[in-house]
């Protein structure tokens, strides 16, 4: 979702044939990073590295709902949990966002937008700088709040475009950081929509602001006041859990939050969750759980059922398979025995036809085959010889017939 900020922006026409940038914007007319204006002559922007977190430093965050601001009747010198969250929002640049120019506040996509729920301030190099800037601005704000409280309360704010601003009185100390956001109060959304957690919970006794807010803060050394602990705390923006409630439950939650929204007894309990966005979250651990779609789960279940049925069939009929194997083996043995008997009888018949081994009942098969070969060759030679003798006798007969015919003709 694009943002409209007060920083000057220029139109860049990238030549995609020669320039292949690492970051692509949804609209080329908007450029969020002023550092890219100095690198317009270069062919390739720098590769994503440790400098990537400088581009995400101090991104503007949307203002909170005015429902909680109207009940900020903080008369004590120490701000409550809701005050601290609003101060962090303002110090991180909440006044730079024009809420009405982004989208409709009643739109569901605006409620579930990534900018509201995760500003990606949990980086490596930006965390230290963010902590330093927030601590300095927090100290400056507290000093100006103590000195110029009445002056800030008497300063008139700009007229709001929607509902009137919070009434003055006990909440005059909060006017210093609320008068700049009065114009954007009409575009705010309900606190129960953005923060689905109930506001009536209380932390354990003795828990610090970091424990109530659910932020990651290092343990501070004991012995200091609450101001020193708040200044030394490491502030980390956490991700809000997505609200999956219906519209009726949202309205009832909004009414309950307005009734129970008090400055000292309304800690916002935030929890970390993983948001699937296009930007890679380097700090999140790798997820090992694999979720399959419904169709794939049905296929896997059907495959398992088929495997179980086949296993049951195999287990239920072991005797049938064994009997079939035994029958096959028995048939094979009978056929093999018959083949061997026929082969033996054929050898015996061949042996009886050979005169050399006819009377030798113990003659081996190899000897029988050799003698049979020799006998066949001898028979073939005798055949050729007899054929030649027959041909000679036929010729002799023809000669004798011709000679007899001549003798008969001479006598006549």
UniProtKB/Swiss-Prot annotation:
Name the principal localization, coarsely classed: host cell
Q: Which cysteines are joined by disulfide bonds?
A: none
Kindly state which keywords UniProt assigns to this record, in alphabetical order. Answer: DNA-binding, Host nucleus, Oncogene
> Gene3D superfamilies this protein is in?
Helix-loop-helix DNA-binding domain
Please list where the region (Leucine-zipper) is annotated: 386-407
The entry's localization annotation reads: Host nucleus
Presence of keyword DNA-binding? yes
Ranges annotated as biased composition (Polar residues): 309-320
Supply one GO CC term from the record. Answer: host cell nucleus
- Extract the ranges annotated as region (Disordered): 144-173, 208-264, 309-328
- Keyword Kinase, does the record have it? no
**Acidic residues bias: where?**
225-236
Show the GO MF annotations: DNA binding; DNA-binding transcription factor activity; protein dimerization activity
**Compositional bias annotation for Pro residues:** 156-169
**Low complexity bias: where?**
239-255
User: Which segments constitute the bHLH domain?
Assistant: 327-379
Q: Provide the coiled-coil residue spans.
A: none
* Described purpose of this protein according to its UniProt entry: Transforms avian and murine macrophages and fibroblasts as well as murine B-lymphoid cells.
Please describe the quaternary structure of this protein. Answer: Efficient DNA binding requires dimerization with another bHLH protein.
Remaining remarks: This protein is synthesized as a Gag-vMht-vMyc chimeric protein. The sequence shown here corresponds to the Myc homolog fragment of the chimera.
Tell me the protein's name: Viral myc transforming protein
Please give the organism.
Answer: Avian retrovirus MH2
Its ancestry begins with: Viruses, Riboviria, Pararnavirae, Artverviricota, Revtraviricetes
